[in-house]
Each structure stands twice: as C-alpha cells, then as structure tokens.
Regions:
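Phenylalanine-focused residue identity feature
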Residues: 20, 38-39, 54, 65, ...
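Active-site recognition of the HExxH zinc-binding catalytic motif
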Residues: 74-86
Length: 154
C-alpha cells in the first residue's frame, strides 16, 4: 500500500488548537496510513518524527478525528503531544525506550517536562477528556491538570 498521507483537517486543527494553542506548527503535521517501521504493531499508533503513523491494517485511522468519538479524539490528542515534543527538538526514537511508562501520579509543582514522554501524552489526553466531561478513573481534578499544562493562555 502506498503511503497515504494527509494534512490535518480544519476540524482537527481546531481540536488540537483547543489544547495546544499556538505551540504547534499545524501546517507541518501529517497523518499517514502507513507503518513508521516494520515492527509497528497493528493497533499501535506512532508519531516519532512529526507524522502520526497508523498501521494500514489497524483500526485507529479516522478520516477526521474532530468528527470521531471522544475516545478517538483522546488518542489524537495523545499523539499530538508527540508532535509537540518533536517540534520542541526531542528526538523521540531515542527518547522513547521500550519500558516507557504510561501511568503516572501528578506531583504538585512538577512541570510537564519532568514526566516521561508517554506520561506527558497521557496527562494531556486525560486533561482533554476531563475538559469535555468524561470520567477518567483514578485521575485527579481538572484543576490539578490545568496548573501543569504549559499551553494555557491564548
């Protein structure tokens, strides 16, 4: 299958901007229905170098994440955290090791960059879901997330 890349839709740009404000170059972002590497599992989404890769036989691809279910939008926001990290100069193929943790405990006063790269993705995803009224089991209050995120303002 040829690499089917596309830019963000207008809705996806607005969805991402509702979280990241102007901290991402949205014109540079691409979504691809191709594996990033031969070892990418079918239902794993990867965004190591500024493009979000969906396995062509996986179930994650959406034509427009802004029109998708809230859980799918949460996945999109998690992957956009990796785009944000990449655009800040983090070389994710080296920063993301096989034992990266997704689970986290918010520590008062600890800035987002002090959490692991996958923990950052989950923290931002959970804040996004809470803002939209979803329940996130075990999550602290939205107020705690809001003090942690560096995208406030705008």
């Amino acid at each position: 299958m040829a690499d089917a890349r596309r830019p963000l839709t207008a809705g996806e740009r607005a969805l991402a901007a509702s979280v990241f404000r102007d901290t991402i170059d949205y014109d540079a972002v691409r979504l691809s229905r191709s594996k990033w590497a031969f070892f990418q599992p079918r239902d794993t989404v990867m965004a190591p170098r500024g493009c979000i890769h969906f396995h062509p036989k996986g179930q994650g691809w959406r034509d427009d994440f802004a029109a998708a279910a809230l859980t799918d939008q949460g996945l999109f926001i998690h992957e956009m955290v990796h785009i944000w990290q990449h655009q800040r100069g983090i070389f994710l193929p080296l920063a993301r090791h096989p034992w990266c943790r997704y689970d986290y405990a918010i520590k008062p006063g600890q800035p987002l960059h002090r959490y692991g790269i996958e923990q950052q993705g989950e923290i931002v995803r959970h804040a996004f879901l809470l803002r939209r009224g979803a329940k996130v089991p075990g999550a602290p209050s939205l107020t705690q997330y809001e003090t942690l995120l560096p995208f406030r303002g705008a």
